[in-house]
């Protein structure tokens, strides 16, 4: 111990006690986090008696201490701390006792954050030293500008074809960094491709990051293989497969190791004669794979006319086939050497079926011509087993998608579900979901593969959102770019009203499908159900913003919430379906907020108290109003549907029927809504639309759907009549001499909301009515324009002469949130929907005789959203007996 004391005194207290001890990041704190004075940086040696006795000239005076002795402390006098007794204890002959009181203090706020920053900086400096950008003895002398210059020089040097400088060391991978930290004397240099997967430091420029990502994706493509045989069929093998050695990168590696191309030549020759499963189990499957012809192909002239109709009116918007390639195979089909592939046989029959249906839809031929379409589809369905069990070519994928598109116009949705799933699975077999930069395809092939994949993708996501079933394609495992915005063949482009501009509608539909996919994945998947309140609200706001950005990118001629400016019937149908899908997606996003009952005190407290980490999209507070408005707009689109087109009706019937359910729910919850009567008229529009479709006795599904929708309309009328009677009875019970005016209300009865109150304003819910109205025509006038209902706690607005439309008063809980009130007011204005005309709807204005509900925004109850919202085409499985209407229409009248 004496040696230790002597060593300590000779070194002084400015030196560390242990030479092999790592330097502390925080010199003012002990190992347990408690603060320690600098002189007591190592308390082990400070209580050592030899330290105090080491100096012979010392007067035996104690070291300076933090506490006085107990007696001096009690008398509140200065203690000199002499040994063995202080002066006062010696004079008064008392015991000099020092009671050690351990005093712990927590580290100051932010200590752990600073510690984390220092740790990260230390690791970053270590990485820079390992990369050669910093020298070992730099000591923090290199400034940031010098580092950036060195990094730029290193980046340009690595991008050139010159050999690497052996003195410069590439940034190692994580495992090598860990090894180098354990053994600082060794350095590891890695190949260039390996260094691309290393963690990027803060000094990496955005350009180098983008370049690295591109090279990594290129390497991933090289690890995939697309093998084509002499029949034109392909087989895709992904990088995760154990057979990825047959990929271009794997073959290149084998060639480099062996020094010759024998392996590559053997693989190529093996695949040339590969017919895969053409002759698999012929004794069992020969009769199944036999091709049955239910209707022979038409003569060439008639077929050419049908093909022209298909490519001019359908394929121009849904580019399922490449026209030059298809017509080449058509010429071969009507020659002496037709192509015998089952994928081509199914494709030509599907095109004929769709072409016949287009003619029937445009009223160019009688309705009986639709039977020909079904017979050609039957030809294609005859080889369905062969398409799914044998084939792996693009024509087979196209044929499956064509069948699915045809069958979407039928009451039974199950075939479309199955065919789309089979098409996507088959597209994986030929690598359509991958960019294919290393497949050696020409630009025309690449573009057509992209188009076919995106058609399958948008069908998959549309089915997913409407049926609530998970999608087939995983968004995390695809890297196909969107179709070209302005392709050379002009596919997908539609002219605008100005006569000069054009817009690619197909690409916009593909972008919309990606939003639909995000809506399901982030709001309705099993993983999404585990989100917190804040995460869910932010997700709703982000998805709503993305959807609105997409809508704003569409020209006004075709933009939702505006009148459709198109004269070509097939084009109108495409645009109408897109508008229906937009309103359905908007409702699906905001239905999650209503579904969870977020217009309750829980949401109000959460939002007003600022518990969300990011500012919320103000439209999340209008979820119910947006759902109901979208339902009204959807029903208004019925006027664009061609009359008598059953295929088209089944394609879009889901949307108006689900909109009717939304309006029905809103009327049940809000019977005193100012637009309730006009909403009943809109429900009647749907009922009358369905009643025009029951002329065909075979359409039992239409009758069941009509019966249910007619019952919804009847119940809504009963609820409205009851609400009006109750309102009239309340007003009749009031004394006419007793004016009701808010000016007579005392501040105690109606306290003004204040953002500074400790208890936030109670948000409205189904059971908690607000004492102040949402809509008032004059927000600045505290009296005269608003009437309070003393009995029920509801409030109503009085109409100001000359004003119509949505009133713009802001609820207190929104007004208390800075920056949101104006956005809220703007969204309540009718301008965003001025282009949407609602048939037979009066202006939205509240009168003194119309009592408004609590919070007055349409509120769809949670209970009804718990209904199965997958009102699909076929209701044949519903066990409840609904009333069946005859062909004369429902009791409410017809169109």
From Swiss-Prot:
Keywords: DNA-binding, Membrane, Metal-binding, Nucleus, Transcription, Transcription regulation, Transmembrane, Transmembrane helix, Virulence, Zinc. Gene3D superfamilies: Zn(2)-C6 fungal-type DNA-binding domain. Pfam families: Fungal_trans (PF04082), Zn_clus (PF00172). One of its GO terms (cellular component) is membrane. It comes from the Eukaryota. The chain crosses the membrane at residues 648-668. Residues 156-218, 726-813 are annotated as: Disordered. The keyword Lipid biosynthesis does not apply. It is found in: Nucleus; Membrane. Transcription factor that regulates expression of the genes related to ergosterol biosynthesis, including erg3B, erg24A, erg25A, as well as cyp51A that encodes a target protein of azoles. In coordination with ffmA and ncaA, is responsible for the expression of the ABC transporter abcC/cdr1B/abcG1 related to azole resistance. Directly binds both the cyp51A and abcC/cdr1B/abcG1 promoters at a conserved 34 bp region called the atrR response element (ATRE). This is ABC-transporter-regulating transcription factor. It comes from Aspergillus fumigatus (strain ATCC MYA-4609 / CBS 101355 / FGSC A1100 / Af293) (Neosartorya fumigata).
């Amino acid at each position: 111990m004496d040696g230790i004391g002597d060593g300590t005194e000779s070194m002084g207290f400015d030196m560390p006690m242990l030479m092999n001890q790592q330097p502390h990041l925080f010199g003012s704190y002990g190992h347990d986090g408690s603060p320690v004075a600098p002189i007591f940086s190592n308390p082990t040696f400070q209580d050592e008696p030899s330290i105090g006795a080491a100096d012979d000239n010392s007067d035996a005076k104690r070291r300076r201490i933090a506490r006085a002795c107990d007696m001096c402390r009690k008398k509140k006098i200065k203690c000199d701390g002499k040994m063995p007794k202080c002066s006062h204890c010696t004079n008064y002959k008392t015991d000099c006792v020092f009671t050690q009181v351990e005093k712990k203090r927590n580290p100051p706020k932010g200590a752990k954050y600073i510690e984390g920053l220092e740790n990260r900086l230390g690791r970053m400096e270590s990485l820079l030293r390992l990369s050669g950008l910093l020298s070992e003895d730099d000591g923090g002398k290199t400034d940031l500008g010098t580092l950036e210059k060195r990094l730029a020089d290193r980046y340009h040097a690595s991008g050139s074809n010159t050999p690497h400088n052996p003195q410069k060391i590439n940034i190692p991978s994580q495992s090598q960094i860990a090894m180098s930290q354990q053994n600082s004397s060794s350095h590891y240099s890695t190949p260039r491709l390996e260094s691309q997967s290393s963690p990027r430091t803060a000094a990496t420029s955005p350009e180098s990051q983008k370049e690295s990502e591109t090279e990594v994706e290129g390497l991933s493509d090289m690890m995939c293989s697309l093998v084509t045989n002499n029949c034109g069929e392909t087989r895709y093998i992904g990088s995760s497969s154990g057979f990825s050695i047959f990929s271009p990168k794997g073959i290149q590696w084998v060639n480099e190791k062996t020094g010759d191309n024998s392996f590559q030549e053997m693989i190529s020759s093996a695949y040339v004669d590969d017919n895969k499963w053409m002759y698999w189990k012929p004794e069992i499957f020969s009769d199944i794979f036999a091709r049955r012809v239910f209707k022979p192909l038409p003569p060439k002239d008639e077929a050419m006319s049908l093909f022209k109709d298909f490519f001019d009116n359908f394929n121009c918007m849904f580019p399922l086939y490449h026209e030059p390639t298809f017509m080449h195979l058509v010429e071969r089909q009507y020659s002496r050497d037709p192509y015998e592939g089952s994928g081509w046989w199914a494709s030509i029959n599907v095109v004929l079926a769709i072409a016949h249906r287009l003619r029937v839809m445009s009223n160019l031929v009688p309705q009986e011509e639709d039977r020909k379409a079904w017979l050609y589809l039957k030809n294609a369905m005859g080889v369905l087993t062969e398409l799914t069990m044998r084939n792996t070519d693009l024509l087979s994928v196209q044929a499956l998608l064509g069948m699915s598109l045809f069958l979407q116009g039928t009451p039974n949705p199950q075939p479309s579900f199955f065919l789309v799933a089979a098409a996507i699975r088959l597209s994986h077999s030929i690598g359509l979901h991958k960019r294919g930069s290393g497949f050696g395809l020409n630009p025309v092939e690449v573009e057509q593969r992209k188009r076919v994949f995106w058609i399958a993708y948008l069908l998959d996501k549309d089915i997913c959102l409407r049926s609530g079933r998970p999608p087939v394609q995983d968004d995390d495992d695809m890297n196909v770019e969107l179709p070209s915005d302005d392709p050379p063949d002009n596919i997908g482009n539609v002219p605008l009203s100005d006569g000069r501009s054009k817009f690619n509608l197909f690409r916009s539909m593909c972008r919309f499908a990606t939003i639909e996919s995000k809506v399901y994945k982030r709001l309705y998947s099993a993983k999404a159900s585990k989100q917190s309140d804040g995460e869910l609200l932010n997700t709703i706001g982000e998805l709503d913003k993305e959807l609105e950005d997409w809508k704003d990118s569409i020209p006004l001629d075709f933009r939702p919430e505006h009148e459709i400016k198109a004269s070509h019937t097939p084009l109108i149908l495409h645009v109408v379906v897109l508008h229906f899908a937009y309103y359905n997606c908007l409702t699906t996003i905001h239905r999650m907020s209503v579904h969870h009952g977020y217009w309750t005190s829980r949401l109000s407290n959460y939002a007003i108290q600022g518990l969300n980490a990011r500012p919320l999209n103000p439209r999340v507070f209008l979820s119910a109003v947006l759902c109901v408005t979208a339902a009204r707009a959807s029903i208004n689109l019925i006027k664009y549907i061609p009359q008598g087109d059953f295929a088209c009706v089944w394609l879009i019937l889901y949307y108006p029927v689900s909109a009717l359910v939304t309006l029905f729910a809103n009327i049940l919850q809000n019977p005193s809504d100012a637009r309730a009567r006009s909403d009943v008229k809109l429900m009647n529009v749907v009922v009358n639309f369905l009643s025009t479709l029951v002329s065909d006795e075979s359409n039992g599904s239409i009758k069941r759907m009509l019966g249910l929708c007619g019952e919804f309309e009847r119940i809504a009328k009963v609820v409205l009549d009851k609400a009006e009677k109750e309102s009239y009875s309340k007003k009749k019970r009031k004394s006419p001499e007793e004016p009701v005016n808010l000016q007579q209300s005392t501040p105690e009865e109606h306290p003004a909301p204040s953002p500074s109150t400790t208890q936030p304003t109670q948000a409205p819910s189904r059971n908690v009515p607000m004492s102040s109205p949402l809509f008032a025509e004059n927000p600045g006038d505290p009296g005269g324009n608003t009437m309070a209902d003393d009995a029920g706690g509801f409030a109503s607005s009085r109409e100001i002469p000359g004003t119509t439309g949505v009133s713009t008063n802001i609820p207190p809980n929104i007004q208390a949130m800075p920056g949101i009130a104006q956005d809220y007011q703007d969204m309540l204005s009718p301008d965003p929907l001025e282009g949407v005309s609602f048939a037979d709807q009066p202006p939205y204005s509240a009168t003194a005789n119309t009592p408004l509900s609590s919070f007055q925004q349409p509120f769809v109850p949670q209970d009804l959203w718990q209904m199965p919202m997958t009102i699909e085409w076929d209701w044949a499985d519903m066990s409840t007996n609904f009333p069946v209407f005859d062909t004369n229409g429902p009791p409410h009248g017809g169109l």
